[in-house]
Amino acid sequence: MFFKIDLKNHPYLIRLKKQEE
């Protein structure tokens, strides 16, 4: 997924990903 790359640039995206799961 594209947001996997963003995880490195945007640590806050990790929170969003946790909410998705």
From Swiss-Prot:
Binds directly to F-actin and induces actin filament bundling. May function as a regulator of actin filament organization. It comes from Tetrahymena pyriformis. The keyword Lipid metabolism does not apply. This is 71 kDa F-actin-binding protein. One of its GO terms (molecular function) is actin binding. To yeast fimbrin. On the 2D-gel the determined pI of this protein is: 7.5, its MW is: 71 kDa. The N-terminus is blocked.
